[in-house]
Amino acid sequence: PYIYHDYPSDEDLYWLFRVGAQLESRALSSAILLQNPLHGDLWHRKIKRRASEGLQLLEDNWERLPEFWNIVCDVLETRHQTKPVHSAEEIKLLHDRLPAHVKLFTVANERDEIITGAVLFVTRQTVHVQYMEAGEEARTRRALDWLIQKLIAHYEQRGMRYFEFGISTERGGLYLNEGLAYQKEGFGGRGVCYDSYLLDLQQATEAME
């Protein structure tokens, strides 16, 4: 998507059109333009001080990854009957190889228990949320909202251009999780499409001759 471009570069889309590629699916993500954010209802809604008191934000505390990953696996299994694409070991390996581009943020409560967190993939101008889940206590205390606000402010201050939440669609874009999309919009996120094309290589070769 264009939010990962340093400069206008839609020549690939034009080429796909010229060689007869067919749009096969369109997923919808949400991103915030950090240089001119549209802070929505969830941004302006105050998080109760009592609920957020005692929360601690931890950055790149990788020894706590297994605790957060247990939350990720539990939420995905319970709510969506699925599993994360990566294992905790794979995420750690990605960080070891690309430490500046794979970041871990976790939130601990007063008992030093991890209750929510996020794994982010960071490019030169865009921060992408790869995994972000919250346990029961975090949902009760709205700790995930608190974390999102902290992350947006963190990367806005560092001059990043976009903060991307990830897709809110399933089945190749045919189903939109409206509640999830609404939540992202509440923080100022707006739509970014992820397109997939089907290309007949023989047809494309003939079109280029």
Language-model segments: what does each one mean?
Residues 1-138, 154, 170:
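A conserved beta-strand-loop-helix scaffold within acyl/acetyltransferase catalytic domains
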